[in-house]
């Protein structure tokens, strides 16, 4: 009998599970029951198209049998069963899931990596010193036995088993001073675990339970008769078998929803919001959806898979149906059960299924309305949600070229320079000053720096509010929207803000005409770094600022240059000088004196300063430092 070895990472994970102590090791039973339920689902699904199988849904079941004397716990199902190849494939290799890295990064946290990463069957080794799996597949003539004591490997041999299905026998570990493994042989403990973790399983989970009853009173018993009791065993169904999403809402507590969410979607935090939906008509379905309370560790990576568990008349046909959710709501978890979907539907035909599209559209509206209700009625929770998933909403607007701005626009939040807190676009508009035509915003990586920008101080001095956008996607999102409720978005560092008085405009035109040659000399000194040099009389105490023209702003340039393959993306820059500042007077004096070298030095200095103010890197920091020192002599 040959001993097969687990593969390298499988061995590490196995060792991790066997030798680590988890406060929630109870989940091993949940995992084994879930696997048994999946096997029953598969056999039932197959029976719908293969009448030779000859079973109904009522024939399928899961049975648990504890044996205190033998110290074994046996979980049996009459599901689809496994062939020798299935045993080798499913039980001989633990899929690489990143759980080792995750556990290493969270040394101090009591995190259930098994629940987090769905290692499933192997959680049995948390409580068992030996695991035996005896299985006979549907349509197979031979049964097979898989057996392992852990990291050293496993064996697969022929076995005797007449019925289709799988039997898993756990030989429990011996008790220690600190660990009581015998509790998993107690029928009360087992019943509680099934109720807690597996009550929604669709198939009956049965177990013989020891009970007590009073013996019949003898006919000749005297007045001094004392009742006598006897113990007996009775087969009991431990689970309700009604999925939580099909129960009347009045019968389900918040704690039930939270527990279902955490068990089903492998999270250790309660959801922020539970969304229930029952719809009849053109699209008949039941949905139970959740807004997670935290960002999944892989959410903003390519590895993250969106989708809802899709059931057809109670039979799961897809674990993650991506077509039920638009990308901007990809954070939503949940299940959808519809009687209108065909049981033998494939992934390919699913995409073209008209019922699925109707369900998706209905869910989209429902999710949007629930998020907006959370914004209105529970602001604190909504702001928690926004910190985790607001970026995805903004990506949704940008990625669809603004097509969904009407749907998503009133969910957006940005930091207000005036209010010093997060505000919605509706709240911004509601407090707009009389005569204000635009929604002003500044984009960058830090709210403090943005609030000190020359044009930011100008906008605020007019009594207008300013949205401080600090995420990479913010400006792209607002540019795609263009406006909100007929109020145009205006980047304070892109183009003319139009905030000058008529007198300031007239004075600026006169100054520009008087200093045309000076501006040409500055532009020449900067050698193509700016498209134009002009005066800006609204800069107050600031000598200079940098603005941009065209579709790409300076902040967008920064973002795009971080992306691979972006090439030499560059914004069109305009150098704006304050005609009322002493620096401008010094520039003008040097020009009138014919000191071209000094004008060139001032031009370089002011340009580099404007880059620093805008949060952009200067081309040559050493040359800049030398220039500053030289002008100080």
Annotated model-derived regions:
Residues 113, 134-153, 173-183, 188-633:
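GHKL/Bergerat-fold ATPase module in large chromosome/replication-associated machines
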């Amino acid at each position: 009998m040959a001993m097969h070895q687990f593969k390298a990472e499988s061995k590490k994970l196995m060792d991790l599970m066997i030798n680590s102590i988890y406060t929630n090791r109870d989940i091993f039973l949940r995992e084994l029951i879930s696997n048994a339920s999946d096997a029953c689902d598969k056999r039932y699904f197959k029976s719908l198209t293969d009448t030779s199988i000859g079973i109904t849904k009522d024939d399928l079941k899961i049975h648990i049998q504890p044996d205190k004397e033998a110290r074994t716990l046996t979980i049996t199902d009459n599901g689809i069963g496994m062939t020798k190849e299935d045993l080798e494939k499913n039980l001989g290799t633990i899929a690489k899931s990143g759980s080792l890295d995750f556990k290493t990064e969270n040394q101090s946290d009591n995190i259930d990596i098994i629940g987090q990463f769905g290692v499933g069957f192997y959680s049995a080794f948390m409580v068992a010193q030996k695991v035996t799996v005896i299985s006979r597949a549907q349509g197979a003539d031979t049964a097979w036995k898989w057996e392992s004591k852990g990291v050293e490997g496993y064996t697969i041999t022929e076995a005797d088993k007449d019925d289709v299905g799988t039997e898993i026998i756990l030989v429990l570990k011996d008790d220690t001073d600190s660990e009581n493994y015998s509790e998993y042989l107690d029928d009360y403990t087992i019943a509680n675990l099934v109720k807690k973790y597996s009550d929604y399983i669709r198939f009956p989970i049965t177990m013989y339970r020891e009970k007590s009853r009073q013996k019949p009173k003898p006919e000749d018993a005297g007045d001094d008769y004392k009742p006598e009791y006897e113990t007996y065993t009775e087969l009991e169904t431990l689970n309700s078998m009604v999925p939580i999403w099909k129960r009347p809402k009045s019968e389900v507590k918040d704690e039930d929803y939270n527990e279902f969410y955490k068990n089903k979607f492998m999270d250790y935090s309660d959801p922020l919001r539970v969304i229930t939906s029952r719809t009849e008509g053109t699209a008949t379905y039941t949905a139970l959806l959740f807004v997670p309370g935290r960002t999944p560790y892989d959410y903003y990576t390519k590895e993250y898979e969106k989708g809802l568990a899709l059931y057809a008349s109670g039979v799961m046909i897809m674990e993650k149906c991506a077509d039920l959710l638009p990308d901007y709501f990809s954070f939503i978890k949940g299940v959808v059960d519809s009687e209108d979907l065909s049981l033998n539907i494939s992934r390919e035909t699913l995409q073209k299924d008209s019922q699925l599209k109707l369900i998706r559209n209905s869910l989209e509206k429902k999710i949007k309305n629930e998020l907006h209700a959370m914004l209105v009625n529970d602001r604190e929770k909504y702001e928690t949600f926004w910190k985790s998933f607001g970026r995805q909403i903004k990506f949704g607007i940008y990625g669809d070229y603004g097509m969904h701005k009407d749907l998503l626009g009133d969910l957006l939040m940005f930091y207000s320079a005036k209010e010093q807190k997060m505000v919605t676009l509706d709240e911004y508009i509601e407090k707009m000053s009389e005569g204000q035509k635009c929604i002003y915003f500044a984009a960058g990586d830090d709210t403090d720096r943005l609030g000190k920008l020359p044009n930011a101080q100008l906008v605020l001095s007019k009594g207008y509010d300013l949205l401080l956008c600090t995420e990479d996607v913010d400006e792209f999102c607002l540019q795609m929207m263009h406006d909100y409720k007929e109020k145009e978005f205006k980047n304070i560092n892109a183009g003319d803000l139009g905030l000058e008085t008529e007198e300031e405009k007239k004075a600026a035109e006169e100054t520009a005409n008087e200093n045309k040659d000076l501006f040409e000399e500055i532009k020449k000194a900067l050698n193509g770094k700016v498209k134009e040099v002009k005066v800006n009389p609204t800069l107050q105490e600031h000598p200079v600022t940098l603005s941009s023209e065209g579709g790409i702003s300076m902040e967008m340039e920064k973002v795009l240059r971080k992306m691979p393959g972006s090439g030499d993306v560059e914004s069109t820059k305009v150098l704006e000088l304050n005609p009322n500042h002493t620096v401008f007077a010094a520039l003008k004096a040097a020009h009138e004196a014919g000191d071209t070298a000094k004008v060139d030095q001032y031009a370089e200095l002011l340009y580099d300063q404007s880059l620093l103010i805008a949060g952009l890197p200067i081309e040559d920091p050493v040359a800049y430092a030398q220039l500053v020192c030289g002008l100080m002599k």
